[in-house]
Amino acid sequence: TTTMSRCRGCVNHCVLTINRFEGGRQYISGNRCERGLGVEKAKRDIPNLFTWKYHRLFDYEPLTADKATRGVVGIPRVLNMYENFPYWATFFKELGFRVMLSPQSSHQIYELGIETIPSESECYPAKLAHGHISWLIKRDVPFIFYPCIPYERKEVPGAGNHYNCPMVTSYSENIKNNMEELKEKDVKFLNPFMAFTSEEILSKQLQEVFKKEFDIPESETKKAAKKAWNELAQARTDVEKKGEEVLQYLKDTGKHGIVLAGRPYHIDPEINHGIADMITSYGFAVLTEDSVSHLGKVERPLVVTDQ
């Protein structure tokens, strides 16, 4: 007999075809990894830096309600936050805001904002942003912070540029102009244009914005920005150290690894469709490009834009 089922082992929800034969034997197809087979996943000790980095970036303890003297700020777990959340988590905590981060992406999150997506041609990571904002609004968050970031830090000296793609740069403008919920619920939606070009430039921009919007003394904002910049640097250092640990693990064990390159938000399980888990299920370690890029030397000039 043949029956259909759906695996619930990960966000892929693979459709399984189960063929049962006489004698109790069965053959399962449609699965992308071993989970759908009902077999205990082998080699759980294989490093997966997609998963490790995801938790390093987002596992920050927010202030308790009694210590949040300036209230709650909602931050969507989207796009540029996969590069800079350590900064914002620290910055707002230092200023006395309790950070409410939207949950891990899922199809349910996507469906929350589907009616406000202005174009089907947008990439899926951008479409998810609508759902994350909607989730925050439904939690009665009075203030949402989602800045426009045209420029990130320059990764290496000599890089051709350090700008974000247009969607990452200004998608919060799209949100502001297409989500009527923000106005209906009287949510303060703050999306200033800022740049991570340098610590000084970003700090100055933040001092101006938070003086204007919340009357926070510039000296206080400057101090918070300093701690936030240091935490962002520490997060990046931790990723590099973890990459070195995995390389040493590969040398010690004789195993193989794969550098799974992509944009920062590709560590989102809903976006990467579990490809990192699939790779580790075959016994390969998974490294992110930023966990090992500091170990190499780029021969210049390049024939592509390096940023």
Predicted features and spans:
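An N-terminal assembly and electron-transfer interface module characteristic of large anaerobic redox
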Residues: 1-307
